[in-house]
Amino acid sequence: MIEIKHLKTLQALRNSGSLAAAAAVLHQTQSALSHQFSDLEQRLGFRLFVRKSQPLRFTPQGEVLLQLANQVLPQISRALQACNEPQQTRLRIAIECHSCIQWLTPALENFRASWPQVEMDFTSGVTFDPQPALQQGELDLVMTSDILPRSGLHYSPMFDFEVRLVLAPDHPLASKTQITPEDLASETLLIYPVQRSRLDVWRHFLQPAGISPLLKSVDNTLLLIQMVAARMGIAALPHWVVESVERQGLVVTKTLGDGLWSRLYAAVRDGDQRQAVTEAFIRSTRDHACDHLPFVRSAERPIFDAPTAKPGSQPRL
């Protein structure tokens, strides 16, 4: 049986013109290459080339195998190249959180610089329930804090962030050292237009204590923060979202209870996380977020190891 390495050896012999030159190209000794040809000819039952011919002359059988090498080897090379190239040339992305768009846009630009051949399709507006579309193949990746059990989806951790209470500087709660669920009972909580069961502040802070404040939906982050500053309500937002306006003194933030932390994931269909494009995108966006967002930490760090703001880091609002 003839193998690919035999075809490559024949081609090297034709291109170099002598056994000694072919051995040098193939990084073998001349005697080893000669022995390899002798073994192959014995197995095939015919000679491949005329020894000591000047110039080197192939037998008719050798010419047939050379033609085979010229046909097969380029096909193998192209097939291997295709295997190493990204199978995905389009990445359809959606997010489940309003505030993610502030850092995801520059992260997309950063990824595109390294993968210009990949078409990025970012769902316009903010989709709050895109995981069913991901399951059905209508999307390729969803940024989410919610894990659906037995969904056939794979969730890659991106980073951890603290959800903090956002208040006007002159709000009565701004002077409290610790915020309890009961402190929010009579407040108006400004939220994004999403079911309250999807909110971390509801699931992990208010609901366990049986507290149900008045909820008011606002679909724009900047407007929501302005309403908080105007004493039209309070909010619970990722710390990095409000870091710059807090430094300006427009709002203050307080820790909820002992600290309310959440984790962002990149969700894909199980198996797709091994696609070259998907893997590179997740790694690129995770690194970008951890390098540029204040008050976030790698999902690999312990939950009790609180991060600090990175000098000069400012979220886009």
From Swiss-Prot:
Residues 19-38 bind DNA. The gene is metR. Gene3D superfamilies: Periplasmic binding protein-like II, Winged helix-like DNA-binding domain superfamily/Winged helix DNA-binding domain. Residues 1-59 form the HTH lysR-type domain. It is found in: Cytoplasm. Control of the last step in methionine biosynthesis; MetR is a positive activator of the metA, metE and metH genes. It is also a negative regulator of its own expression. Pfam families: HTH_1, LysR_substrate. It comes from Salmonella typhimurium (strain LT2 / SGSC1412 / ATCC 700720). This is HTH-type transcriptional regulator MetR.
